[in-house]
Protein backbone atom coordinates (compact mmCIF):
# COMPACT_ATOMS: atom_id res chain seq x y z
CA UNK A 1 0.00 0.00 0.00
CA UNK A 2 1.38 3.42 -0.95
CA UNK A 3 2.12 6.06 1.66
CA UNK A 4 -0.79 8.43 2.35
CA UNK A 5 -1.33 12.04 1.47
CA UNK A 6 -0.76 13.95 4.72
CA UNK A 7 -2.54 17.26 5.32
CA UNK A 8 -1.37 19.50 8.17
CA UNK A 9 -4.35 21.51 9.42
CA UNK A 10 -8.10 21.07 9.75
CA UNK A 11 -9.49 24.46 8.79
CA UNK A 12 -11.60 25.44 5.80
CA UNK A 13 -8.76 24.95 3.29
CA UNK A 14 -7.86 21.48 4.57
CA UNK A 15 -11.43 20.23 4.62
CA UNK A 16 -12.28 21.79 1.25
CA UNK A 17 -9.30 19.90 -0.17
CA UNK A 18 -10.46 16.60 1.36
CA UNK A 19 -13.93 17.05 -0.15
CA UNK A 20 -12.43 17.89 -3.55
CA UNK A 21 -10.12 14.84 -3.48
CA UNK A 22 -12.95 12.52 -2.48
CA UNK A 23 -15.03 13.69 -5.45
CA UNK A 24 -12.20 12.39 -7.64
CA UNK A 25 -10.99 9.36 -5.68
CA UNK A 26 -12.88 7.66 -2.84
CA UNK A 27 -10.02 5.47 -1.65
CA UNK A 28 -6.65 7.23 -1.88
CA UNK A 29 -5.34 7.22 1.73
CA UNK A 30 -5.42 10.60 3.50
CA UNK A 31 -4.23 11.48 6.99
CA UNK A 32 -4.97 14.80 8.71
CA UNK A 33 -2.83 16.16 11.55
CA UNK A 34 -4.36 18.96 13.60
CA UNK A 35 -3.45 20.64 16.87
CA UNK A 36 -7.16 20.93 17.81
CA UNK A 37 -10.09 18.50 17.78
CA UNK A 38 -10.72 18.81 14.03
CA UNK A 39 -14.30 20.08 14.31
CA UNK A 40 -15.68 21.50 11.06
CA UNK A 41 -17.13 25.01 11.34
CA UNK A 42 -17.70 28.08 9.16
CA UNK A 43 -14.99 30.56 10.16
CA UNK A 44 -16.65 33.72 8.71
CA UNK A 45 -19.48 33.18 11.21
CA UNK A 46 -17.08 34.24 13.98
CA UNK A 47 -17.61 37.88 12.95
CA UNK A 48 -21.34 37.67 13.71
CA UNK A 49 -21.66 35.51 16.83
CA UNK A 50 -22.57 38.34 19.21
CA UNK A 51 -25.70 39.68 17.51
CA UNK A 52 -26.86 36.10 16.86
CA UNK A 53 -26.07 35.12 20.47
CA UNK A 54 -24.25 32.00 19.28
CA UNK A 55 -21.95 29.93 21.46
CA UNK A 56 -18.82 28.21 20.14
CA UNK A 57 -20.74 24.92 20.20
CA UNK A 58 -23.45 26.43 17.97
CA UNK A 59 -20.90 27.00 15.20
CA UNK A 60 -19.79 23.37 14.92
CA UNK A 61 -21.10 21.80 11.71
CA UNK A 62 -19.55 18.38 12.33
CA UNK A 63 -17.18 16.86 14.87
CA UNK A 64 -13.72 15.86 13.72
CA UNK A 65 -14.59 12.18 14.18
CA UNK A 66 -17.76 12.51 12.10
CA UNK A 67 -15.89 14.34 9.33
CA UNK A 68 -13.15 11.68 9.28
CA UNK A 69 -15.72 8.90 9.02
CA UNK A 70 -17.77 10.58 6.30
CA UNK A 71 -14.76 11.35 4.10
CA UNK A 72 -12.74 8.20 4.85
CA UNK A 73 -9.70 9.94 6.31
CA UNK A 74 -7.53 9.16 9.32
CA UNK A 75 -7.65 12.06 11.78
CA UNK A 76 -4.77 12.69 14.20
CA UNK A 77 -6.50 15.18 16.52
CA UNK A 78 -4.59 17.18 19.15
CA UNK A 79 -1.40 16.20 17.33
CA UNK A 80 1.09 18.93 16.48
CA UNK A 81 3.47 18.31 13.58
CA UNK A 82 6.88 19.29 14.93
CA UNK A 83 9.10 18.74 11.89
CA UNK A 84 9.06 17.67 8.27
CA UNK A 85 11.91 15.46 7.05
CA UNK A 86 11.85 16.23 3.34
CA UNK A 87 14.57 13.76 2.31
CA UNK A 88 12.78 10.86 4.02
CA UNK A 89 9.28 12.19 3.13
CA UNK A 90 8.13 11.97 6.73
CA UNK A 91 6.46 14.23 9.27
CA UNK A 92 7.39 14.05 12.95
CA UNK A 93 4.60 14.34 15.54
CA UNK A 94 4.64 13.30 19.20
CA UNK A 95 8.08 11.78 18.66
CA UNK A 96 6.88 9.45 15.89
CA UNK A 97 7.63 9.54 12.17
CA UNK A 98 4.79 9.27 9.65
CA UNK A 99 5.63 8.70 5.95
CA UNK A 100 3.84 10.60 3.18
CA UNK A 101 3.63 10.32 -0.58
CA UNK A 102 2.56 13.97 -0.83
CA UNK A 103 2.34 16.56 1.92
CA UNK A 104 -0.01 19.56 2.10
CA UNK A 105 0.44 22.54 4.40
CA UNK A 106 -3.00 23.95 5.28
CA UNK A 107 -1.73 25.50 8.49
CA UNK A 108 -3.63 28.76 8.13
CA UNK A 109 -2.62 31.97 9.87
CA UNK A 110 -2.56 33.33 13.37
CA UNK A 111 -3.89 36.69 14.50
CA UNK A 112 -1.23 39.39 14.44
CA UNK A 113 -1.00 41.25 17.75
CA UNK A 114 0.97 44.51 17.46
CA UNK A 115 3.63 45.24 20.10
CA UNK A 116 2.17 46.81 23.26
CA UNK A 117 3.28 47.27 26.87
CA UNK A 118 1.53 46.56 30.16
CA UNK A 119 0.56 43.82 32.58
CA UNK A 120 -2.81 43.31 30.86
CA UNK A 121 -1.49 41.85 27.60
CA UNK A 122 -2.55 38.33 28.61
CA UNK A 123 -6.15 39.62 28.63
CA UNK A 124 -5.99 40.72 24.96
CA UNK A 125 -8.19 38.29 23.01
CA UNK A 126 -8.27 37.27 19.35
CA UNK A 127 -11.06 35.70 17.33
CA UNK A 128 -9.34 33.80 14.54
CA UNK A 129 -10.53 30.27 15.35
CA UNK A 130 -13.26 28.33 17.09
CA UNK A 131 -10.86 27.60 19.95
CA UNK A 132 -10.11 31.31 20.39
CA UNK A 133 -13.83 32.07 20.53
CA UNK A 134 -14.30 29.33 23.13
CA UNK A 135 -11.68 31.08 25.28
CA UNK A 136 -13.12 34.56 24.66
CA UNK A 137 -16.82 33.68 24.85
CA UNK A 138 -17.42 34.26 28.57
CA UNK A 139 -15.26 37.40 29.01
CA UNK A 140 -16.86 39.00 25.95
CA UNK A 141 -20.40 38.09 27.00
CA UNK A 142 -19.82 39.84 30.36
CA UNK A 143 -18.10 42.90 28.86
CA UNK A 144 -20.03 46.15 28.48
CA UNK A 145 -17.29 48.15 26.74
CA UNK A 146 -15.05 46.37 24.20
CA UNK A 147 -12.04 47.93 22.52
CA UNK A 148 -11.26 46.49 19.07
CA UNK A 149 -7.70 46.88 17.79
CA UNK A 150 -7.81 47.06 14.00
CA UNK A 151 -10.18 48.71 11.55
CA UNK A 152 -9.75 46.29 8.66
CA UNK A 153 -12.29 43.86 7.25
CA UNK A 154 -12.63 41.60 10.31
CA UNK A 155 -12.27 44.40 12.86
CA UNK A 156 -15.07 46.42 11.28
CA UNK A 157 -17.41 43.41 10.99
CA UNK A 158 -16.79 42.40 14.62
CA UNK A 159 -17.14 45.97 15.92
CA UNK A 160 -20.52 46.44 14.25
CA UNK A 161 -21.70 43.05 15.45
CA UNK A 162 -20.67 43.83 19.03
CA UNK A 163 -22.47 47.19 18.85
CA UNK A 164 -25.58 45.52 17.39
CA UNK A 165 -25.57 43.15 20.37
CA UNK A 166 -25.78 46.16 22.71
CA UNK A 167 -22.17 46.72 23.70
CA UNK A 168 -20.20 49.95 23.78
CA UNK A 169 -17.40 49.66 21.21
CA UNK A 170 -14.22 51.63 20.50
CA UNK A 171 -12.14 50.86 17.39
CA UNK A 172 -8.45 51.82 17.30
CA UNK A 173 -6.94 51.93 13.80
CA UNK A 174 -3.43 53.19 12.87
CA UNK A 175 -4.49 54.38 9.41
CA UNK A 176 -6.39 57.58 8.70
CA UNK A 177 -9.52 55.64 7.69
CA UNK A 178 -11.15 52.26 8.06
CA UNK A 179 -10.40 49.49 5.55
CA UNK A 180 -7.55 51.64 4.23
CA UNK A 181 -6.01 48.76 2.25
CA UNK A 182 -9.32 47.75 0.69
CA UNK A 183 -11.52 50.80 0.02
CA UNK A 184 -11.08 54.26 -1.51
CA UNK A 185 -11.64 57.16 0.89
CA UNK A 186 -15.04 58.16 -0.52
CA UNK A 187 -16.38 54.68 0.34
CA UNK A 188 -14.71 54.47 3.76
CA UNK A 189 -16.20 57.76 4.99
CA UNK A 190 -19.89 56.73 4.73
CA UNK A 191 -18.97 53.41 6.38
CA UNK A 192 -17.39 55.31 9.28
CA UNK A 193 -20.54 57.44 9.58
CA UNK A 194 -22.66 54.29 9.75
CA UNK A 195 -20.50 52.84 12.51
CA UNK A 196 -20.72 56.08 14.49
CA UNK A 197 -24.54 55.99 14.12
CA UNK A 198 -24.36 52.67 15.97
CA UNK A 199 -22.50 54.40 18.80
CA UNK A 200 -19.07 53.07 17.83
CA UNK A 201 -16.23 55.39 18.81
CA UNK A 202 -13.43 55.57 16.24
CA UNK A 203 -9.83 56.35 17.18
CA UNK A 204 -8.17 56.70 13.76
CA UNK A 205 -4.49 57.52 13.22
CA UNK A 206 -3.99 55.83 16.58
CA UNK A 207 -2.34 52.82 18.11
CA UNK A 208 -2.48 51.19 21.53
CA UNK A 209 0.64 51.83 23.62
CA UNK A 210 -0.28 49.83 26.71
CA UNK A 211 -2.91 47.59 28.30
CA UNK A 212 -2.89 47.65 32.10
CA UNK A 213 -5.04 45.73 34.55
CA UNK A 214 -7.03 48.06 36.81
CA UNK A 215 -9.24 45.99 39.09
CA UNK A 216 -11.99 44.44 36.97
CA UNK A 217 -11.26 46.72 33.99
CA UNK A 218 -8.40 47.30 31.57
CA UNK A 219 -6.77 50.72 31.23
CA UNK A 220 -5.87 51.45 27.61
CA UNK A 221 -3.34 54.15 26.73
CA UNK A 222 -3.02 55.30 23.12
CA UNK A 223 0.19 56.72 21.68
CA UNK A 224 -1.38 60.20 21.51
CA UNK A 225 -2.12 60.30 25.24
CA UNK A 226 -5.80 59.35 25.13
CA UNK A 227 -6.95 56.79 27.68
CA UNK A 228 -9.91 54.42 27.95
CA UNK A 229 -11.22 52.12 30.64
CA UNK A 230 -12.73 49.03 29.01
CA UNK A 231 -13.91 45.56 30.01
CA UNK A 232 -12.30 43.63 27.17
CA UNK A 233 -9.80 44.07 24.34
CA UNK A 234 -10.18 42.17 21.07
CA UNK A 235 -7.36 42.30 18.54
CA UNK A 236 -8.24 42.09 14.83
CA UNK A 237 -5.11 43.70 13.41
CA UNK A 238 -4.49 41.26 10.57
CA UNK A 239 -3.06 37.80 10.07
CA UNK A 240 0.40 36.25 10.04
CA UNK A 241 0.77 33.00 8.08
CA UNK A 242 1.82 29.91 10.06
CA UNK A 243 5.06 29.07 8.28
CA UNK A 244 7.50 27.99 11.02
CA UNK A 245 7.47 24.25 10.25
CA UNK A 246 7.70 24.90 6.50
CA UNK A 247 10.58 27.32 6.95
CA UNK A 248 12.45 24.87 9.20
CA UNK A 249 11.94 22.18 6.54
CA UNK A 250 13.82 24.38 4.06
CA UNK A 251 10.84 25.39 1.92
CA UNK A 252 10.79 28.79 0.25
CA UNK A 253 8.90 31.15 2.58
CA UNK A 254 8.23 34.89 2.30
CA UNK A 255 5.03 36.32 3.80
CA UNK A 256 3.58 32.85 3.27
CA UNK A 257 4.74 29.48 1.95
CA UNK A 258 5.64 30.20 -1.67
CA UNK A 259 3.66 28.16 -4.21
CA UNK A 260 3.13 28.25 -7.96
CA UNK A 261 -0.14 27.99 -9.92
CA UNK A 262 -0.21 24.26 -9.20
CA UNK A 263 0.07 24.95 -5.43
CA UNK A 264 3.50 23.29 -5.46
CA UNK A 265 6.15 24.55 -3.03
CA UNK A 266 9.89 24.52 -3.67
CA UNK A 267 9.76 20.76 -2.87
CA UNK A 268 8.08 18.67 -5.62
CA UNK A 269 6.27 16.47 -3.05
CA UNK A 270 4.94 19.31 -0.88
CA UNK A 271 2.04 21.71 -1.50
CA UNK A 272 0.32 24.52 0.39
CA UNK A 273 -3.06 26.25 0.20
CA UNK A 274 -5.23 28.62 2.19
CA UNK A 275 -4.13 31.42 4.49
CA UNK A 276 -0.59 30.00 4.83
CA UNK A 277 0.08 30.01 1.06
CA UNK A 278 1.60 32.80 -1.00
CA UNK A 279 0.41 32.14 -4.57
CA UNK A 280 2.81 33.59 -7.14
CA UNK A 281 3.60 36.39 -4.68
CA UNK A 282 0.03 37.09 -3.51
CA UNK A 283 -1.63 36.40 -0.16
CA UNK A 284 -5.33 35.68 -0.76
CA UNK A 285 -7.10 35.12 2.59
CA UNK A 286 -10.59 34.76 1.11
CA UNK A 287 -12.89 31.79 0.62
CA UNK A 288 -13.20 31.81 -3.19
CA UNK A 289 -9.47 31.47 -3.97
CA UNK A 290 -9.27 28.69 -1.37
CA UNK A 291 -12.11 26.79 -3.06
CA UNK A 292 -10.47 27.21 -6.48
CA UNK A 293 -7.07 26.21 -5.03
CA UNK A 294 -8.57 23.09 -3.44
CA UNK A 295 -10.10 21.99 -6.76
CA UNK A 296 -6.77 22.41 -8.58
CA UNK A 297 -4.70 20.77 -5.85
CA UNK A 298 -7.09 17.81 -5.57
CA UNK A 299 -6.46 17.04 -9.24
CA UNK A 300 -2.72 17.32 -8.72
CA UNK A 301 -2.86 14.91 -5.78
CA UNK A 302 -4.68 12.22 -7.75
CA UNK A 303 -2.33 12.51 -10.72
CA UNK A 304 -4.28 14.84 -13.00
CA UNK A 305 -2.92 18.02 -14.56
CA UNK A 306 -4.43 21.30 -13.40
CA UNK A 307 -3.41 24.94 -13.07
CA UNK A 308 -4.91 27.64 -10.88
CA UNK A 309 -6.45 30.55 -12.77
CA UNK A 310 -7.90 33.28 -10.59
CA UNK A 311 -10.75 35.31 -12.10
CA UNK A 312 -11.78 38.72 -10.69
CA UNK A 313 -13.16 37.82 -7.27
CA UNK A 314 -15.76 39.47 -5.07
CA UNK A 315 -14.96 40.67 -1.57
CA UNK A 316 -17.94 41.30 0.69
CA UNK A 317 -17.81 43.54 3.75
CA UNK A 318 -20.55 41.97 5.86
CA UNK A 319 -21.77 45.06 7.70
CA UNK A 320 -25.57 44.65 7.50
CA UNK A 321 -26.47 48.31 8.01
CA UNK A 322 -24.07 49.35 5.22
CA UNK A 323 -23.14 46.36 3.03
CA UNK A 324 -20.20 46.76 0.65
CA UNK A 325 -19.07 44.54 -2.22
CA UNK A 326 -16.01 45.08 -4.39
CA UNK A 327 -13.88 43.35 -7.00
CA UNK A 328 -10.98 43.97 -9.33
CA UNK A 329 -7.97 46.22 -9.00
CA UNK A 330 -7.75 49.89 -8.15
CA UNK A 331 -5.05 52.18 -6.86
CA UNK A 332 -4.52 55.86 -5.99
CA UNK A 333 -3.96 56.41 -9.74
CA UNK A 334 -7.39 55.01 -10.65
CA UNK A 335 -10.05 57.30 -12.10
CA UNK A 336 -13.51 56.77 -10.63
CA UNK A 337 -16.96 57.05 -12.15
CA UNK A 338 -19.17 57.52 -9.11
CA UNK A 339 -22.94 57.44 -8.74
CA UNK A 340 -23.99 58.73 -5.31
CA UNK A 341 -27.45 58.59 -3.76
CA UNK A 342 -28.99 58.23 -0.28
CA UNK A 343 -29.46 54.51 -1.09
CA UNK A 344 -25.77 53.87 -1.67
CA UNK A 345 -22.86 54.21 -4.08
CA UNK A 346 -21.85 52.65 -7.39
CA UNK A 347 -18.19 53.36 -8.19
CA UNK A 348 -16.31 52.02 -11.22
CA UNK A 349 -12.52 52.25 -11.35
CA UNK A 350 -10.70 52.98 -14.58
CA UNK A 351 -7.02 52.78 -15.39
CA UNK A 352 -5.27 55.90 -16.74
CA UNK A 353 -5.92 54.39 -20.19
CA UNK A 354 -9.67 54.23 -19.53
CA UNK A 355 -9.97 50.45 -18.99
CA UNK A 356 -12.56 49.19 -16.48
CA UNK A 357 -10.47 47.57 -13.74
CA UNK A 358 -12.69 47.28 -10.65
CA UNK A 359 -15.75 48.45 -8.76
CA UNK A 360 -17.24 49.10 -5.35
CA UNK A 361 -20.98 49.07 -4.62
CA UNK A 362 -22.65 49.89 -1.31
CA UNK A 363 -26.04 49.95 0.36
CA UNK A 364 -28.97 49.00 -1.84
CA UNK A 365 -26.72 48.99 -4.91
CA UNK A 366 -25.03 45.73 -3.90
CA UNK A 367 -27.60 44.14 -6.25
CA UNK A 368 -25.44 45.48 -9.10
CA UNK A 369 -22.34 43.63 -7.89
CA UNK A 370 -22.78 40.44 -9.93
CA UNK A 371 -23.56 42.16 -13.26
CA UNK A 372 -20.47 44.34 -12.73
CA UNK A 373 -18.39 41.28 -11.81
CA UNK A 374 -19.57 39.58 -15.00
CA UNK A 375 -18.55 42.63 -17.04
CA UNK A 376 -15.17 42.72 -15.29
CA UNK A 377 -14.59 38.99 -15.96
CA UNK A 378 -15.51 39.37 -19.63
CA UNK A 379 -13.01 42.21 -20.01
CA UNK A 380 -10.34 40.20 -18.18
CA UNK A 381 -10.90 37.29 -20.57
CA UNK A 382 -10.94 39.45 -23.42
Swiss-Prot record:
SUPFAM superfamilies: FAD/NAD(P)-binding domain
Family recorded in the similarity comment: Belongs to the FAD-dependent oxidoreductase family.
Record keywords: Cytoplasm, FAD, Flavoprotein, NAD, Oxidoreductase
Coiled coil feature spans: none
EC numbers for this chain: 1.18.1.-
Compartment(s) of residence: Cytoplasm
InterPro entries attached to this UniProt entry: FAD-bd_OxRdtase, FAD/NAD-bd_sf, FAD/NAD-binding_dom, NO_rdtase_NorW, Rbx-bd
Pfam family, one: Pyr_redox_2
Catalysed reaction, written as an equation: 2 reduced [nitric oxide reductase rubredoxin domain] + NAD(+) + H(+) = 2 oxidized [nitric oxide reductase rubredoxin domain] + NADH
Pathway connected to this protein: Nitrogen metabolism; nitric oxide reduction
Cofactor: FAD
Record-level GO cellular component terms: cytoplasm
Entry function: One of at least two accessory proteins for anaerobic nitric oxide (NO) reductase. Reduces the rubredoxin moiety of NO reductase.
Protein name per its UniProtKB record: Nitric oxide reductase FlRd-NAD(+) reductase
Molecular function as annotated in GO: oxidoreductase activity, acting on iron-sulfur proteins as donors, NAD or NADP as acceptor
PANTHER family hit by this protein: NITRITE REDUCTASE [NAD(P)H], PYRIDINE NUCLEOTIDE-DISULFIDE OXIDOREDUCTASE DOMAIN-CONTAINING
